[in-house]
Amino acid sequence: MQTNLLPLSKLNKGQKGIVRQIDEQLLPHDVELEAGELERQILEIGIIENVELKVLHFGLINRDPIAVQVGGDGTTIAIRRNESEIILVEPIK
């Protein structure tokens, strides 16, 4: 893993990052899914390696879920904070 990568959940509102890795081994232990299931779901909604993400908003309770703009076409998705932990991004300055 590159040292400058952060989980998506660590970005600030308005901050952008490039997806560099999706690693289910980083999934919190309280999330029970079959191996590969969460990664498949994330890929299906368009979060793939090398796509740009922008954090748009955090939910009111525990900053959960996180609203994220995916790519440059304006697609917005919401993802649970604990699931966003497996999406490793390289922050864009």
Predicted region positions:
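Compact, charge-rich alpha-helical regulatory domains located at protein termini
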Residues: 1-48, 54-60, 64-93
